[in-house]
Amino acid sequence: MKLKLILAVAMLAFSLPSQAERIKDIANVQGVRSNQLIGYGLVVGLPGTGEKTRYTEQTFTTMLKNFGINLPDNFRPKIKNVAVVAVHADMPAFIKPGQELDVTVSSLGEAKSLRGGTLLQTFLKGVDGNVYAIAQGSLVVSGFSADGLDGSKVIQNTPTVGRIPNGAIVERSVATPFSTGDYLTFNLRRSDFSTAQRMADAINDLLGPDMARPLDATSVQVSAPRDVSQRVSFLATLENIEVEPADESAKVIVNSRTGTIVVGQNVKLLPAAVTHGGLTVTIAEATQVSQPNALANGQTTVTSNSTINASESNRRMFMFNPGTTLDELVRAVNLVGAAPSDVLAILEALKVAGALHGELIII
């Protein structure tokens, strides 16, 4: 029943006719993107759920030195309310200094929970090594953990990961190529030559010939004004132009772990006959004891009797006619009552036989 439902939903989704979509929904402007930031810091104020690792102590000692407090070299602070953490955030395009970012804080060591902790000032750096934001604040942790004296433990969700809403202040903005050059380039989220050509045609229909040109299956280049304010207005007009994306190529996607099968609308089959049966072999071992007569000169022996049974389930053979469609394929699969693993075997065999017109993708 589950297989029938999954296949039916997939068939419905892929059978829907393509509809026009706005350019902003199917493409991005080249160079306008977010940037990842990461930092290393300390969370303090934990209620005994911190850690005592060596690198935690070193980080704690370094922090104290920055405040002018020097500890003896052989002194090891006993701390249970501190944890070392990784802090990361996404920095959107065009964000300016003084604006705020949400940050995620994750434990790096043996801390049991970050609940109730506070992140101390942490520099967030980009891939170029420059500091772009500074994070600090109290954590919001949805998970929790509790330990009993008898060794029992209760953990819900993930207590070693938390978030700080608006927990980082941007100190430096990232330059983008948006306001430079004579062109804007749109990159399709799903590469397709037909969709790229249709996008260029739709833009040219509105703005005039030769304003847009497809560069490849992903990129469409558009002539744009150099004035920044005009460029913003120009882009606002472009991103609301509607384009009808091209049909997807014929694909069959199979998740071998979950048994989910998605069949594209354009998948077709050449003439083929399929039958699928299962061979079951059962081996049973029976142990018997041979006990000689009490007055006989014999020894007690143990013998094993093996019983082997083999059975093969019979399945009806079904045939695919030329140009078999998605609907007919689904009905045929349901007719034989095939399990997801059986369907995968059938699809692989059809692909090897050259009867499956479409790309078989196993994930």
From Swiss-Prot:
Residues 1-20 form the signal peptide. GO terms for molecular function: structural molecule activity. Disulfide bonds: none annotated. One of its GO terms (biological process) is bacterial-type flagellum-dependent cell motility. Keywords: Bacterial flagellum, Periplasm, Signal. GO terms for cellular component: bacterial-type flagellum basal body, distal rod, P ring; outer membrane-bounded periplasmic space. It comes from the Bacteria. It is found in: Periplasm; Bacterial flagellum basal body. The keyword Transport does not apply. Assembles around the rod to form the L-ring and probably protects the motor/basal body from shearing forces during rotation. The basal body constitutes a major portion of the flagellar organelle and consists of four rings (L,P,S, and M) mounted on a central rod. Belongs to the FlgI family. HAMAP family: FlgI. This is Flagellar P-ring protein. The gene is flgI.
